[in-house]
Amino acid sequence: MKTRFQFGLFALALLMAGCGGNKGGEPVADRPIIQMDSIDYPDLPDGATIRMSKSDFPKGKIRSIEQIPIEGLEITNREIDHLMVKDYLIIKHLEFRKGANLVHVVSLPDYRLVAEMAPFGEGPDEFHDVRLIPTEESDKLCYVLNCADGRLCYLSNDLRLVPCGHRVAPGRGPNVNLFVGKDLLLTEHDSSEGKGLIAVNQRDSTVTGLLPLHFSENVGGYFYLVSFAHSYQKRRVAISFLFHDRIGFFDFDGGHPKFIRFGDKTLKTLASPENPMYYHNCFANDHYVFAVYRPSNYNTEKDRETFLEQYDWDGNLVARYELPKDRGFYSGYATNESDTEIYLVDYYEDQFLHRVTLERP
């Protein structure tokens, strides 16, 4: 399973004018600057990181788990990425039978396959990874990035894949992406000192550092692998860490950061297989952030305890739910239609999509 988790200041100020939020921490302009890999970042302010325990969560319950068959879709490999937008569930996965990554479009609420975009990669030995990138542009469902060559397409509202050139990004392999608007891209930038969250202007290639992630000494960007959730309404981002027992919340411009640290501050070693994994995914609607917490040394351990954690966008703990141990619930999505129903993907089942009903304390 893959964990995927991913302007000029004047443009950002215009974009963010009037947005609400949390908050925790300070606005960007009030923070000292640090530098990583020649990019300036406003450092995390004092008090932005707080220590908490899992026992601080109110305990919630799983009321029901219902499997949802998808008509016309058969997936034999669990390397799945997905994005819910408007009336569609967009699914990307590596299809061994066809030797390429495929993008499927499933209509909601009838869960019927209505389009398939393919292929990305020639196969059988060349599998071009593609990334589904959300956008708030009303004439598009999402962007689709070919990670091998940087070519960018968008998926139109009439379900066509339209080329739109190359994406502007720094040279060091960002692997989490979020379009804020037509010309603005939030992404991540690896360096030997850590990972930085940056904003890239697609018109003039201006790079602005938003947040530095470097809370373990002498650790490169790989060990800060994150999952990325967002709310366009709140203008907020949430990130959960694979190799660190912590989760963070901040504005689209990096302002008002709040990080919650549950576990140890440092890694066990600089060899990733020897480090426990914690957060495998986070996702959100406009009201809440959900994170899948599965502490283990290997993500194939089926008997590990798995929990779903729920937060509000200010980073306050809402509830923690215990999920079945023998299931492969690693990711999911939430809609604004209900605050008690979410959708989880089981990576161990062919019929992978499940509707989960929650009971908050």
Name every feature range the model reports, one short phrase each.
Residues 46-77:
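A short helix->beta-strand "capping" segment at the edge of beta-propeller domains
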Residues 16-18:
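C-terminal motif of bacterial Sec signal peptides marking the signal peptidase cleavage site
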Residues 78-85, 130-138, 175-181, 224-234, ...:
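Structural signature of eukaryotic scaffold interfaces centered on beta-propeller domains
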Residues 274-311:
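Loop/turn-rich, solvent-exposed surfaces of beta-rich toroidal or solenoidal domains
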Residues 103-109, 198-201, 304-316, 355-360:
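Beta-propeller blade signature
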Residues 66-101, 290-294:
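Beta-strand-rich domains and repeat architectures in extracellular enzymes and scaffolds
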Residues 125, 264-272, 316-337:
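Conserved blade-ending motifs and adjacent loop-strand segments that build the rim/top face
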Residues 112-140, 215-219, 327-329:
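Blade-loop segments of beta-propeller domains
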